[in-house]
């Protein structure tokens, strides 16, 4: 499909990133940090987003923060990769349109807009930026996910309608969440009212579509993008990143990535794809991988076997543990001989049942698990909990719980 190239006056060099949301469906992992700061591989999702923007030529970033905003500010500071970051606060979570309005005094001229909780290939950003020439430009993807993400009607390069809740299977083109806007979007947003507790960005885009003197363009793309809706999606994200080699650690073998400061015992085995971040210690006899992402300063005990796992920073796993399809948060102490056998499992989140999920378990931040414990498939342990030795964990454990035999 042909695209109308943008002029230097309309090609955006600034970007707004929406990173204010909590991510309720990702609990218990989001109890203490926002969804964009959850791990994708060994880096926060938001870090991957900023990398994509900068790789696409963005030199001015505006972050809209809200829930647990200090977790974002303290991690990134005022610059990232020599690009300045300006923070804007959304005090109340009133939707994506309301979030964007908080950055009205930020970018001058045309700008890009992306979600801070969705990993995108920088080539999608480049395509949207390069095609932008009027009020708005959207990345459009073809696939069955239109039911979940909102469908679009595309006539040539022009979007004629957004369909927020399409009937299943009726539409194949959907909004990928990568945008370029003129300043007109702010004027439109200010004419809209908050209804049903939120101000959706899509309402403003539809208003632009309905205006006779503006055009909303669509750019079709088949480049990689992915987000995490549920805790087990972090495993899928990690698999995709490892498969593509989208990791920071140096390559020591074809698909084995190990930071220089990591300490791998000569008798330990890494099975690719696997990434081991800085200051990790992996002891003798451990087998790590495939599809394992080990965050900085983690410790993997002797004889432990890990496969299809995301282990976040500062977490220690005791010896002789076996864990499959496990997401473990920051600062956890997991005792010796822990068993996490992997899915499938029926998982209950917010009173909704998800069947046949490939999930061994989720352990949120700062959890202590005693030796010889077992996580039944799909177990969810809230932050700050203590699980005694030998306990069999099933279902959901609330934050701060103490579970004994």
Regions found by a protein language model. Give the residues of each.
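Short N-terminal binding/cap micro-motifs at the start of the first secondary-structure element
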Residues: 23-28, 147
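Conserved donor-nucleotide/metal-binding helix-loop-beta segment in metal-dependent transferases, i.e.
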Residues: 123-148
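Glycine-rich hexapeptide-repeat left-handed beta-helix
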Residues: 308-405
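Extended, small-residue-rich solenoid/repeat segments and analogous flexible loops
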Residues: 198, 207-297, 301, 305
């Amino acid at each position: 499909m042909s695209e109308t190239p943008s002029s230097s006056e309309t090609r955006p060099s600034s970007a707004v990133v929406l990173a204010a949301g909590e991510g309720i469906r990702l609990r218990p992992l989001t109890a203490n940090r926002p969804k964009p700061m959850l791990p994708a591989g060994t880096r926060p999702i938001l870090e991957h987003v900023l990398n994509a923007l900068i790789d696409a030529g963005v030199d001015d970033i505006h972050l809209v923060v809200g829930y647990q905003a200090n977790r974002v500010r303290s991690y990134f500071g005022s610059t990232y990769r020599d690009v300045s970051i300006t923070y804007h606060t959304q005090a109340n979570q009133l939707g994506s349109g309301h979030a964007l309005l908080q950055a009205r005094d930020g970018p001058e001229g045309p700008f890009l807009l992306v979600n801070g909780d969705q990993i995108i290939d920088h080539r999608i950003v480049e395509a949207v930026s390069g095609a932008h020439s009027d009020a708005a430009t959207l990345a459009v993807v073809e696939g069955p996910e239109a039911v979940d993400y909102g469908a679009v009607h595309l006539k040539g390069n022009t979007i004629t309608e957004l369909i927020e809740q399409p009937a299943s299977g009726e539409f194949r083109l959907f909004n990928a969440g990568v945008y370029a806007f003129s300043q007109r979007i702010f004027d439109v947003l200010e004419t809209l009212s908050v209804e049903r507790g939120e101000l959706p960005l899509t309402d403003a885009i539809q208003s632009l579509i309905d205006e006779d003197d503006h055009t909303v363009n669509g750019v079709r793309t088949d480049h990689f993008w992915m987000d995490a809706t549920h805790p087990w999606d972090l495993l899928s994200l990690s698999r995709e990143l490892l498969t593509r080699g989208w990791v920071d650690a140096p390559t020591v073998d074809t698909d084995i990535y190990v930071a220089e400061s990591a300490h791998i015992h000569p008798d330990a085995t890494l099975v690719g794809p696997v990434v081991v971040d800085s200051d990790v210690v992996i002891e003798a006899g451990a087998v790590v991988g495939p599809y394992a992402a080990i965050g900085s300063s983690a410790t993997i005990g002797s004889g432990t076997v890990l496969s299809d796992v995301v282990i976040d920073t500062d977490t220690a796993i005791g010896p002789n543990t076996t864990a499959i399809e496990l997401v473990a948060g920051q600062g956890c102490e997991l005792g010796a001989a822990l068993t996490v056998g992997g899915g499938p499992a029926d998982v209950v989140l917010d009173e909704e049942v998800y069947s046949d999920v490939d999930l061994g378990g989720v352990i949120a931040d700062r959890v202590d698990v005693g030796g010889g414990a077992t996580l039944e498939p799909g177990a969810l342990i809230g932050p700050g909990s203590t699980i005694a030795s030998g306990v069999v964990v099933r279902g959901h454990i609330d934050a701060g719980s103490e579970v004994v035999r």
